Design a protein with these regions (language model features):
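Short loop/turn elements that form and flank the Walker-type P-loop nucleotide-binding site
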Residues: 39, 63-65, 101-103
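Post-Walker A helix-loop "phosphate-sensing" segment adjacent to the P-loop in P-loop NTPases
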Residues: 52-59, 97-98
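C-terminal lobe/lid and adjacent interdomain/linker elements of RecA-like ASCE P-loop ATPase modules
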Residues: 85-178
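Amphipathic alpha-helical domain-onset/packing element
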Residues: 1-16
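Catalytic Walker B motif of ABC-type/P-loop ATPase nucleotide-binding domains
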Residues: 59-64, 68-73
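Conserved D-loop-proximal element of ABC-family nucleotide-binding domains
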Residues: 64, 77-80, 84
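Conserved ABC ATPase signature
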Residues: 23-51, 74-80
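Beta-sheet entry/capping signal
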Residues: 12-14, 42, 67-68, 104-107, ...
């Protein structure tokens, strides 16, 4: 069901269990993992990540436990259509876990500034929902970045990705970059 959710399609990518083995189908045809894109393989890995967490548990009970979720660059290698599906899927999954237990923590890392802004909006909405559900406890989230081998607060207001890249290129051209 997760693959349908991400691709907005019944047959786009599917995994079926047949004759004691798993079969990968793309648009109804058997394919090997090497025959699908890197982005599609990453989507399968992310779906497996969440499915594995809930293994041998009832759906309702699986989110009530405390978790630390760590997701590294969930939308790398995706075209725009898959990016929309994966961000929607992430919002849904993170919502289940964060609303399931006030102590659950979710760390999502990315190198892409546009993805960061999308995740920022998702987290703002999820935090608001969590604060409504857990009225006595207030959830918060941190926006952090690693720069020059240090982790610091991410100054995201008035920051433009292309401007930042041009500054880095300029400093490199002057020999000032590390």
């Amino acid at each position: 069901n997760s693959l349908k959710y991400i691709f907005f399609s019944e047959d786009r990518l599917k995994i079926e269990y047949r004759d004691d083995e798993y079969v990968l189908l793309s648009n109804g045809h058997n394919v090997k993992p090497t025959q699908i894109s890197l982005g599609e393989r990453n989507i399968i890995a992310l779906c497996y990540y969440f499915a594995n967490i809930m293994q041998n548990q009832e759906f309702e009970e699986s989110h009530a436990q405390e978790y630390i979720l760590l997701i590294d660059d969930p939308v790398s290698s995706f075209d725009i259509e898959n990016k929309v599906g994966i961000m929607s899927f992430l919002k849904y999954q993170l919502g289940l876990f964060l609303l399931g237990n006030i102590n659950t923590k979710a760390i999502v890392m990315t190198h892409d500034l546009l993805t960061f802004y999308d995740l920022d909006k998702i987290y703002e909405e999820l935090i608001e929902n969590c604060n409504e559900k857990f009225s006595g406890d207030k959830m918060k989230f941190n926006r952090l970045e690693m720069a020059k081998q240090n982790i610091k607060q991410f100054e995201y207001k008035n920051r433009q990705e292309y401007t930042e890249l041009i500054k880095i290129i300029y400093k490199y051209a002057l020999g000032e970059a590390e």
